[in-house]
């Protein structure tokens, strides 16, 4: 007997509808059919994974050509422009100094549901985003989403990766993000905040007040998704953060990146019924401290409610640190 079957046998079940030994025998027969279906599903998923790997290799030259055109490394020929339904825009003027397609990926992201976590402070940095690539990691089903940036005033990274590591059964294991190497004074994902602490009076001593400066996370695309800099307070919260990250990565990988030009044009949609609202998953809680401390805001990612959404509060303004 397989380990999976042993686990299934240990699961509790409702026996109220099993009214006789004959019905029990029939239910066990259905469970046998279910075992076979599970085995076929597992086999199907493995074969689908192999097909995806095969076609990912075929897609790569197309993605590279797209990058060359977007970045301005090459100019498309007349033959390159023979699409099935070319678009026309009236009253455009020639600007020979224009290079590539400016802010292509910024416009792509702003036309997806990811826009809900893009703040004003993200926009200038995202203007330097020149490509998003899907990279298969070895022979495993692991893959990474690589964000490629041109030289910019914010950080020294040219590539920031989010690597998805999966178990053999395709279950999510972990997501590893590249740390961002911020340039001095350019980290807009944190802000300094003064906190006043008042001590309790003791015999012979009056209460004293001291001030200290703390670094607080500013919720935005870079701090909550690209390279999260929040420390989860529990294993449950860590799992929730990872799950939300995976939802965004999967949507970018499966829907947005393959259809990037249509998202750029605003004529594609990544919204699905009962979809997560990513902006609402990154919730800003406000709470009152006791008399020893002034009011302090804490940024957390909240667990979705039964409807698959957590209700947000307004995020604080983005400031550079």
Curated annotation (Swiss-Prot):
InterPro entries for this protein: NAP-like_sf, NAP_family
SUPFAM superfamilies from the UniProt entry: NAP-like
Bias-annotated ranges (Acidic residues): 272-298
Entry annotated with the keyword Metal-binding: no
Segments of skewed composition (Low complexity): 311-321
Main location: nucleus
GO molecular function: chromatin binding; histone binding
Subcellular localization: Nucleus
Spans annotated as Disordered: 272-321
GO biological process, one term: nucleosome assembly
An annotated GO cellular component: chromatin
Keywords for the protein's UniProt record, in alphabetical order: Nucleus
tRNA processing is among the record's keywords: no
Family: Belongs to the nucleosome assembly protein (NAP) family.
Entry domain remark: The acidic domain may be involved in the interaction with histones.
Purpose: May modulate chromatin structure by regulation of histone octamer formation.
The name this protein goes by in its record: Probable nucleosome assembly protein
Organism: Dictyostelium discoideum (Social amoeba)
């Amino acid at each position: 007997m397989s380990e999976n079957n042993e686990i299934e046998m240990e699961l509790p079940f409702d026996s109220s509808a099993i009214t006789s030994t004959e019905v029990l025998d029939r239910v066990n027969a259905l469970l046998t059919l279910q075992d076979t279906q599970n085995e076929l599903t597992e086999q199907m998923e493995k074969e689908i994974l192999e097909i995806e790997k095969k076609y990912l290799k075929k897609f790569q030259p197309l993605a590279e050509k797209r990058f060359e055109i977007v970045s301005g490394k090459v100019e498309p020929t007349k033959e390159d422009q023979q699409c099935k339904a070319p678009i026309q825009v009236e009253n455009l003027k020639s600007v020979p100094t224009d290079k590539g397609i400016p802010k292509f990926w910024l416009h792509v992201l702003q036309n997806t549901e990811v826009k809900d976590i893009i703040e004003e402070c993200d926009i200038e940095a995202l203007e330097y985003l020149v490509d998003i690539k899907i990279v298969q990691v070895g022979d495993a089903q692991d893959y990474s989403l690589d964000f490629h940036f041109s030289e910019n005033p914010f950080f020294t990274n040219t590539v920031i990766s989010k690597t998805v590591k999966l178990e053999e059964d395709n279950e999510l294991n972990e997501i590893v993000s590249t740390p961002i190497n911020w340039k001095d004074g350019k980290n807009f994902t944190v802000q300094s905040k003064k906190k006043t602490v008042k001590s309790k009076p003791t015999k012979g001593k009056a209460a004293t007040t001291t001030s200290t400066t703390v670094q607080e996370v500013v919720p935005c695309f870079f701090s909550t998704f690209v390279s999260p800099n929040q420390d989860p307070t529990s294993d449950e919260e860590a799992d929730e953060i990872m799950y939300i990250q995976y939802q965004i990565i999967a949507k970018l990988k499966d829907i947005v990146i393959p259809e990037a030009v249509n998202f750029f044009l605003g004529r594609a949609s990544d919204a699905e019924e009962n979809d997560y609202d990513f902006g609402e998953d990154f919730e800003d809680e406000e709470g009152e401290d006791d008399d020893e401390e002034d009011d302090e805001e804490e940024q957390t990612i909240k667990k979705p409610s039964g409807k698959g959404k957590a209700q947000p509060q307004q995020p604080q303004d983005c400031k550079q640190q």
